[in-house]
Amino acid sequence: MSPDTPRGGDLHPPEPDAAATAGPEGTPPDTEPAAEVIGVRHGMFGIRGTGDTSGYGRLVRPVTLPGGTAPPYGGWFDEVVDRLRTALENSGTPFGSALEKIVVFRGELTLHVRREHLVTVARLLRDDPALRFELCLGVNGVHYPDDAGRELHAVYPLRSITHNRLLRVETCAPDTDPHIPSLFEVYPTTDWHERETYDFFGILFDGHPSLTRITMPDDWRGHPQRKDYPLGGIPVEYKGARIPPPDERRAYS
């Protein structure tokens, strides 16, 4: 019986101790007053019942997301948020309908945008002269299985070359409806990034011109970077594979 095994009728997880919950270099974990706790992680990768002797098997950490930040946000953050608010109102979109929350965490600004307003917000961030976030640096997929109703997140880092500023736009979708509008028409550089995020997380980017796998084979089952993907992988499926001649291969553009 391992130390983590409940005894008798006690089905509660063990209480975390200082060593088990220590952050980098032994520092205590951050305690953000507005943090949203969406789950608890047990062990290094959430795996139980192994012969782990490293000590990480007893790791117990809350899974948290930064909560919303109240204004003022400081520095140019207020200028960007105020200008975006004005631009949205002028376009007929209420600011509160388009954005779920605004987060300032570790000196960085993140705009949490509802997916149905993602394209509108992105276009305003790109085109408004006072904003001018001309460059999208990519798309990062994240899977939070415990974040009920918003398990799949897509994060877009945006850079303003004109004003030398960097922020993030984040949106989400549920596992049961993993659709997010593509930003290809606003930022063409998201082409392959959205394909990669679809390939590894299963997010369907509506409006993408060619949303196909980019790394895994076309007939691969599942999305390898999701938390529910088997940690040990799956049997190799390349046996008997046939490489089509050039005139039969799939076009990527």
Swiss-Prot record:
EC number: 7.1.1.-
Region (Disordered) location: 1-33, 234-253
Membrane protein topology class: Peripheral membrane protein
Molecular function terms from GO: NADH dehydrogenase (ubiquinone) activity; NADH:ubiquinone reductase (non-electrogenic) activity; quinone binding
A Pfam family: Complex1_30kDa
EC class: translocase
Record's keyword terms, sorted: Cell membrane, Membrane, NAD, Quinone, Translocase, Transport
Keyword Ligase among record annotations: no
Catalysed reaction equations from the record: a quinone + NADH + 5 H(+)(in) = a quinol + NAD(+) + 4 H(+)(out)
TM region positions: none
Subcellular compartments: Cell membrane
UniProt cross-references to InterPro entries, sorted A to Z: NADH_DH_suC, NADH_quin_OxRdtase_su_C/D-like, NADH_UbQ_OxRdtase_30kDa_su
Top-level taxonomic group: Bacteria
Cellular component terms (Gene Ontology): plasma membrane
Its job: NDH-1 shuttles electrons from NADH, via FMN and iron-sulfur (Fe-S) centers, to quinones in the respiratory chain. The immediate electron acceptor for the enzyme in this species is believed to be a menaquinone. Couples the redox reaction to proton translocation (for every two electrons transferred, four hydrogen ions are translocated across the cytoplasmic membrane), and thus conserves the redox energy in a proton gradient.
Family: Belongs to the complex I 30 kDa subunit family.
Subunit structure as annotated in this protein's UniProt entry: NDH-1 is composed of 14 different subunits. Subunits NuoB, C, D, E, F, and G constitute the peripheral sector of the complex.
UniProt-recorded name of the protein: NADH-quinone oxidoreductase subunit C
Organism of origin: Nocardia farcinica (strain IFM 10152)
